Amino acid sequence: MPVLHASGLARTFPTERGTVEAVRGIDLTAERGEILGFLGPNGAGKTTTLRMLTTLLTPTGGTATVAGCDLVRDPAGVRRASGYVAQSGGVDPHVSVREELVTQARLYRLGKAEALARAEELAAGLGLDGLLDRKTATLSGGQRRRLDIAMGLTHRPEVLFLDEPTTGLDPGSRADLWELIRRIRAEHGTTVFLTTHYLDEADALADRLVIIDKGVVVAEGTPEALKRAHAGSPGASLQDAFLALTGSGPAPQGPSPLAV
């Protein structure tokens, strides 16, 4: 049984000019231990879908489960089974790495001694063990992203949602984070749901891709299968396939007027 399953997932928003259909019936699955890339141009519905799957937004149609827990009937169960790393992160710049990790563990009701042990375990596993007593404000961009991911893994989730995890990182830090994501999957069997605007990243990391546009799924499959089916020539890139499917290039970096 897929660890993540959505059927007809939809979300509308009322506006002064009428109802906006941000997501119009998305079907998708992710298997245990799979890295699933979720792609689409700005306004395609990626953000809305991710917010629904992480219980931050209630669907107006369809159903979805995470680790067998229904988004609407059991949102607490979904949150117990999920880790979520937002694009902007969320660390307190005035505390140490250790304090941030312990606080996160305590939020998941770990005892003080267990929380301290879990903080050290996460730091060792994610290359932060030499930084435990550093203030988070002094960390590099790559180190902060590792801390964000460590916080998302505190409660050993079955599914880890990563929203644009390498945005703003230099090439070396991006490569390091790619390797970390692969290792998390390999060592723990964690399912990773990855949104990204970097098509080289999706090509390198994802076992399978779901591409959406205008609130619906327009294609899914392995990166190689999508390139063969939609890029139009041998040796074509994932970007060629993406352009053919959506009629637009990767969304520009930086804020958009309305992210749905």
Report residues per predicted region.
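Conserved ABC ATPase "signature" region
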Residues: 102, 106, 113-131
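Conserved ABC ATPase signature
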Residues: 135-139
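Conserved catalytic motifs of ABC-family nucleotide-binding domains
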Residues: 156
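Catalytic Walker B motif of ABC-type/P-loop ATPase nucleotide-binding domains
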Residues: 160-163
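Helical segment within the ABC ATPase nucleotide-binding domain
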Residues: 175-188
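ABC ATPase "signature
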Residues: 220-221
